[in-house]
Amino acid sequence: MPHITVLGAGSWGTAISKHLVDNDQKVTIWDRNKKLLQEIKEGRNSRYLPTLKLPSNDINVEGDINESLTNAQIVILAVPVQHISEVLSKIHKSSLTNKEVIFVNLSKGIEINNRKIPSKIFEEYLSGFNYCTLSGPSHAEEVAENVPTSVVIGGIDDQVNKYIQEIFSSETFRVYTNNDLIGVEISGAIKNIYAIGAGIIDGFGKWDNTKAALITRSLVEIIRYGTYYGGKKETFMGLAGIGDLVVTCTSSHSRNRYVGEMLSKGMSLKTILEQMVMVAEGVYTAKAVYNDAKEKEIEMPIASKIYQVLYEGVDPKTAIYELMTRDLKSEFFN
């Protein structure tokens, strides 16, 4: 049985820790919030998963990141993308030298300043270590409650992928493998932008036609952006792509969808973010992708309009009107 360390005691870190313990794995969870760790030790996480009953004393807690990495064989990165560099820097400076350790990333997003997905940030600090990403339609709240869920482990090493697949899989958590790491991470990052758009639509009422069009045309943009960077088209048609896009655009658990809904009801972005407990990665990813797509000349009209609503004060209904009245064209083109 491998020793597993989870870095980050947010909703995902807590949910995956519970899942792994339920799956008879040995887990230590680290976070810099000592109060949160004490709660987890007592069997709860009132900040991120307040209704969840945790297996008290079965999850080891550790407030020192160096201690948490001692004897670790699998390290799970469960921190927001905008903070992942800080955590990776701590690991780089730690005593961890065993290159057999496998890192499993759970974060979905693109770093706002350097426009990098998690695997590219990881390479800057821990090149040479094993790395893969777990992604797909998997809200932490449902995983923690053992709701049947299917996900993808994406990584360049098939043997590592298969090993992690076996460790994580259970009767309620089915893991597929995919060697398209780039495609898996880009899918998980960019769908958050479009979830904001879906929330905007929800705020206006039951606009089912509009939401169906948004999801479908958003997938086209994800494929354009992802294949530009070498992702495989079939990845975007699978769990990491369309699967995650659908659940994020439709679920009441979606933080990014919530942001869009509040925007369409007239609340400012600043106020929305101040009131949220958890991070809405799509807000930051929208800026990174907008600037990158503009620079690379990748056509992403929906993502561009969502960026304008977030950062340029464009009225959501105006953004929809401008999308609907663009030049007419064929549905499919190269």
Swiss-Prot record:
Presence of keyword DNA damage: no
A Pfam short name: NAD_Gly3P_dh_N
Record localization: Cytoplasm
Annotated transmembrane regions: none
GO biological process, one term: glycerol-3-phosphate biosynthetic process
Residue positions binding sn-glycerol 3-phosphate: K108, G136, S138, K191, D244, S254, R255, N256
Annotated Gene Ontology cellular component terms: cytosol
GO function term, MF aspect, one: glycerol-3-phosphate dehydrogenase [NAD(P)+] activity
UniProt main location, coarse: cytoplasm
UniProt xrefs under SUPFAM superfamilies: 6-phosphogluconate dehydrogenase C-terminal domain-like, NAD(P)-binding Rossmann-fold domains
Reaction catalysis annotation: sn-glycerol 3-phosphate + NAD(+) = dihydroxyacetone phosphate + NADH + H(+); sn-glycerol 3-phosphate + NADP(+) = dihydroxyacetone phosphate + NADPH + H(+)
Alphabetical keyword list: Cytoplasm, Lipid biosynthesis, Lipid metabolism, NAD, NADP, Nucleotide-binding, Oxidoreductase, Phospholipid biosynthesis, Phospholipid metabolism
Metabolic or biological pathway: Membrane lipid metabolism; glycerophospholipid metabolism
Residues that coordinate or bind NADPH: S11, W12, R32, K108, A140, R255, V279, E281
EC number(s) recorded for this UniProt protein: 1.1.1.94
Active site: K191
Enzyme class of the recorded protein, top EC level: oxidoreductase
Family under the similarity heading: Belongs to the NAD-dependent glycerol-3-phosphate dehydrogenase family.
Role this protein plays: Catalyzes the reduction of the glycolytic intermediate dihydroxyacetone phosphate (DHAP) to sn-glycerol 3-phosphate (G3P), the key precursor for phospholipid synthesis.
HAMAP family: NAD_Glyc3P_dehydrog
Family matches, as NCBIfam families: PRK00094.1-2 (NF000940), PRK00094.1-4 (NF000942)
Name this polypeptide is given: Glycerol-3-phosphate dehydrogenase [NAD(P)+]
Organism: Petrotoga mobilis (strain DSM 10674 / SJ95)
